[in-house]
Curated annotation (Swiss-Prot):
Signal peptide extent: 1-21
UniProt-recorded name of the protein: 22 kDa alpha-zein 14
Organism annotation: Zea mays (Maize)
One Pfam entry name: Zein
Family membership noted in the UniProt record: Belongs to the zein family.
Other facts noted in the record for this chain: The alpha zeins of 19 kDa and 22 kDa account for 70% of the total zein fraction. They are encoded by a large multigene family. Structurally, 22K and 19K zeins are composed of nine adjacent, topologically antiparallel helices clustered within a distorted cylinder.
Function (record text): Zeins are major seed storage proteins.
The entry's keywords: Seed storage protein, Signal, Storage protein
PANTHER family (alphabetical): 22 KDA ALPHA-ZEIN 8, ZEIN-ALPHA A20-RELATED
Length: 266
């Protein structure tokens, strides 16, 4: 009887020690599937704690704030790369034409290069072209100033007082330079009329816009020479017939072999 009581007490003591015992996973030999049953839910309690939640929210806000400038910089860099790519493609498209222009006419090529970097050229192409034309006439005016200062001063005074000079300075300078080279052109007209017409074409734009005004101007310029030289007078008659004679337009050489027609009309 006493042995039964002692054995029951021993069993009760074993059960009590088993329920109150703490299991250490590192030193336990139990399977890993049994260990979580005896561990407290530390992880879930930690994530549900307000301090941990506030810390996580702060970290998320800081990460988003730091990522926004990085995203903006990435977008700006992508936009810059896109613009550079488009500019490179356009430059590659124009490179053959620019290379050909540089070989044929280096001055025009340099003017095209300066036009892209000139604010005046981008804002007002007409004003830029007039400025370039004025620069083309500067060497001739400088030579005139060195050879004949009085004539140069007269040109400057006429340039500031003439309505044509104020409205269109390049055209005015072309007319003035044309008047200066009239003697040489007159000799060329007597010797070779075809070459004379070819020389007149790039200098005077008035013939294309208003042929009547051009003829009047030529008469005013060359009438004194025509009085002194009958050959010049005959040539002027032929020149006046030129815009109205289809045959002379087709063959200027043969038209100058008919001075009787010009003398009969005029």
């Amino acid at each position: 009887m006493a042995t039964k009581i002692l054995s029951l007490l021993a069993l009760l003591a074993l059960f009590a020690s088993a329920t109150n015992a703490s299991i250490i996973p590192q030193c336990s030999l139990a399977p890993s599937s049994i260990i979580p049953q005896f561990l407290p839910p530390v992880t879930s309690m930690a994530f549900e704690h307000p301090a941990v939640q506030a810390y996580r929210l702060q970290q998320a806000i800081a990460a988003s704030v730091l990522q926004q400038p990085i995203a903006q910089l990435q977008q700006q860099s992508l936009a810059h790369l896109t613009i550079q790519t488009i500019a490179t493609q356009q430059q590659q498209q124009f490179l053959p034409a620019l290379s050909h222009l540089a070989m044929v006419n280096p001055i025009a090529y340099l003017q095209q290069q300066l036009l892209a970097s000139n604010p005046l050229g981008l804002a007002n192409v007409v004003a830029n072209q007039q400025q370039q034309q004025l620069q083309q006439f500067l060497p001739a005016l400088s030579q005139l100033a060195m050879v004949n200062p009085a004539a140069y001063l007269q040109q400057q005074q006429l340039l500031s007082s003439s309505p044509l000079a104020v409205a269109n300075a390049p055209t005015y300078l072309q007319q003035e330079l044309l008047q200066q080279i009239v003697p040489a052109l007159t000799q060329l007209a007597v010797a070779n009329p075809v070459a004379y017409l070819q020389q007149l074409l790039p200098f005077n734009q008035l013939t294309m816009s208003n042929s009547v005004a051009y003829l009047q101007q030529r008469q005013q310029l060359l009438n004194p020479l025509a009085v002194a030289n009958p050959l010049v007078a005959a040539f002027l008659q032929q020149q006046q017939l030129l815009p109205y004679n289809r045959f002379s337009l087709m063959n200027p050489v043969l038209s100058r072999q008919q001075p009787i027609v010009g003398g009969a009309i005029f």
